[in-house]
Amino acid sequence: MGSRRPRLPGFGEDCEPRGGGRGGGGRGRGSYYPQAQQYHPQGHGGRGGAGYYHGAAPQPRGAMVVQQWRPATAAAEHLGHQQPYNSSVRPQHYYGPSAIAPELLQAMDAPHEPPANVSSPEAASPEASSPRSLALEVTEQLQDLSVQYQLSESQEEIVQHVPVSTKSFKFPHRPGSGSIGTRCLVKANHFFAQLPDKDLHQYDVSITPELTSRIRSRAVMEELVRLHKMSYLGGRLPAYDGRKSLYTAGPLPFTSKEFRISLLEEDDGSGSERRQKTYNVVIKFAARADLHRLEQFLAGRQAEAPQEALQVLDIVLRELPTARYAPFGRSFFSPDLGRRRSLGEGLETWRGFYQSIRPTQMGLSLNIDMSATAFFEPLPVIDFVIQLLNTDIRSRPLSDAERVKIKKALRGVKVGVTHRGNMRRKYRISGLTSQATRELTFPVDQGGTVKSVVQYFQETYGFAIQHTYLPCLQVGNQQRPNYLPMEVCKIVEGQRYSKRLNQNQIRALLEETCQRPHDRERDIIQMVNHNSYHEDPYAKEFGIKISERLALVEARILPAPRLKYNETGREKDCLPRVGQWNMMNKKMVNGGRVRSWICVNFARNVQESVASGFCRELARMCQASGMDFALEPVLPSMYARPDQVERALKARFHDAMNILGPQHKELDLLIGLLPDNNGSLYGDLKRICEIDLGLVSQCCCTKQVFKMNKQILANLALKINVKVGGRNTVLVDAVSRRIPLVTDRPTIIFGADVTHPHPGEDSSPSIAAVVASQDWPEVTKYAGLVSAQSHRQELIDDLYNITHDPHRGPICGGMVRELLISFKRSTGQKPQRIIFYRDGVSEGQFYQVLLHELDAIRKACASLEANYQPQVTFIVVQKRHHTRLFAHNHNDQNSVDRSGNILPGTVVDSKICHPTEFDFFLCSHAGIKGTSRPAHYHVLWDENNFTADALQTLTNNLCYTYARCTRSVSIVPPAYYAHLAAFRARFYMESDSSDSGSMASGRGGGSSTSRSTRAAGGGAVRPLPALKDSVKNVMFYC
């Protein structure tokens, strides 16, 4: 978004690989050769001198071990002759997608002063710690990521390439446990699981005819076990995954056997008669699950988790709840597990629990948490429609809009009929008739005789249809549709609602699941007791024993950092208490400037005098907080209708510019007053301001205007300040250069996230966002970029890319590259360290994301300058997990905050964490409502060799620098900002589809450039519209 920057292949002022500067006598930066990654300096010293990245890298902990490349014959024929890794070659030119993929090189040491001689990095010896299939997959994916660099705009392109290699993945080992902070004990919702002492056997299952439904497959297997458990199965009680695998505790009496099982046909929802159907089931021995490897892994003597053994144990413990409850993902729901609550529009909540077996330092643990989700209420269809439309439709026909809404809501839903006595046939709704019931007829014989639906129901069932002006439900297939009047149908119980909830439903669901810590802990314990794992026949069969006590875990409470404010304030710094502080007697460390501003009021119930008074008080608060803020607007406040938002904003903007233009001034800020329920207005306003007008804006809801206390005004001032380029606070330790591995040499901190469309929006792209710090050593101000990419794709495509200009040839680009250049422009320094916080990655995607995104970071760095390889630490941030931490004693006021949650700064890096890898749970925020969810940080790559204390303290301290409030936040700010940026970008593409401004309010986007990617099927993803240059480099997304 925003016009693309001119091509800047290097950190220098122009595109030539030259340097200058005063020292060293050489002319320019030196020669860049793609030979063994060596840099041959022609001179150094001075500000334009040679690169200062040299020497063999310190071996990153764990790490991806690089082998010297040895091409196979076929590969050599395809790729051409390659030189050994450390030999010299002449410069070569590679262009286009057939170029050779670069290595994921380990970073080289990067001292401030350039050396006289630079040596090439040495390849480390290979290790073989991953399964062969993973290594092959990694290599294949790396080869698919082939790309080349353009380092210069000159006629002779200097292109660096690094050869492909095989590699063995090994995430960093834990560098010991942390020691900083006050030690304490907390309880975690993990329950120790004792490993079985039995041999686990796996059998392949083949069912003919083939079944796609897990429910039907389980029904077949349940019947087989019922008939043959004590005979052919040798008394074994097997666990079945619902697809192709069966597991037993010990061998079956055969290696392969075929069974014939007869069941009533599955109810397909068409209403046809169900008949007996016979299935052939073949059970064949496949393998033994190796529990010894699992024991070795849990003891820390093996790096690779034996997923097969963990999967078997997980399936065993899921077998009974799957039979009892409605399973969805790793959760189970039932109306018997807690009270139901209506969500409105025909939906209700079902309570349930989440269950997952996990390898941890204390051994195997079963993670149990409370859960809730939305189900259809088992209502008569007419009652459902009345709730859906929020109006009684029993006395009038439906409008076309109402018909469309009903059809969309009911398509695919199962209903039972009520007009046939005890015969409750079930049908699946495929549509809605366009005609009213009284107008519907159907043929009854081949002679062309027709009968009305009303007449048929009267004659056949003795049922008089009352609401004949309503349409019928259409059930069955399109070739032979059946018509059912709404009044004879009732929604079948137990159908989960998988579409997008509206804001009121989301709010009601959150209220239902929001529990104080003590209550949630009690419910979890009760759920474990209710599940009676000690009586579970499958757990007993396999010898698995589950503790009924929450894990007691050692934790530490990290101290809050001291925050720096402006010297002109009465308080020049402060120490937060329990994760909170305020702006009283303080001034922003760098106040922004707002010399010209306007206000547009879209809230009908806010009078002009009230709007003007609110803006005046807000301007005074901004001034008092340290901003250079004009007290009077350029033009008086103006009311505009929400449906005229574009016309009103553009007209008012041009009126203001007619005044400011002759004075050579720009409009700095728009204040928008919005109704509390503003629909798509918020997103429309942001899109128009940032895309069309190049103007930052601050939206305020009606309730804020009427409440207008100092806290509200102070929070708005914080947001406005960073939107116009100011900084609210910085860490005292950053200013005094006391943050290990951050302030000792130029460091850039990235945050990245991908947001996906809501369920049902199959054509919408996913939005990737990357932000990066633009100040050093303070690391407080962030710029951001966003990119549209293929639907529901988690890997970020546009971290590094090459576009092909017909006149200039290949041009390097990408979000990481542009943010590195922006950092150099802002600070005058080249980053020598990269700390990359990646949000939203599940454990199953760790390898894939690291492979793709670390590779892109490496390419982006190498495209800027030969041998430019800053040391990278790559950390995944996870919030969508189910680990909860509780105070050991809820009545101890010194160990809980006001909400009853554990204190901010509580960190856990033992017992419930990974057996060997570098991860930790950090609760960095004070609870407000409900039970706090700690963030989980997992280090996937670490060339900076962080200690546990250094990374935990850095992460916790950064959580106090979030720009929008005077509270520490729950995840590290760069990841938070990336999340906001991705959501803001969706407004630019979906300005008409937002259901509610309340969801949108406060979510923003990053400084960004218009980007386009290709979908997996080859279709172009619609590019994001361009952001104006005047808002690109400020934190307007706050």
UniProtKB/Swiss-Prot annotation:
Keywords: RNA-mediated gene silencing
Keyword RNA-binding: no
Gene Ontology MF term list: RNA binding; RNA endonuclease activity
Matching Pfam families: ArgoL1, ArgoL2, ArgoMid, ArgoN, PAZ, Piwi
GO biological process: regulatory ncRNA-mediated gene silencing
Region (Disordered): 1-58, 110-134, 992-1021
Family matches, as PROSITE patterns: PAZ, PIWI
InterPro entries per record: ArgoL1, ArgoL2, Argonaute_Mid_dom, Argonaute_N, PAZ_dom, PAZ_dom_sf, Piwi, Piwi_ago-like
Family recorded in the similarity comment: Belongs to the argonaute family. Ago subfamily.
Name of the protein: Protein argonaute 1D
Organism the protein comes from: Oryza sativa subsp. japonica (Rice)
Gene expressing this chain: AGO1D
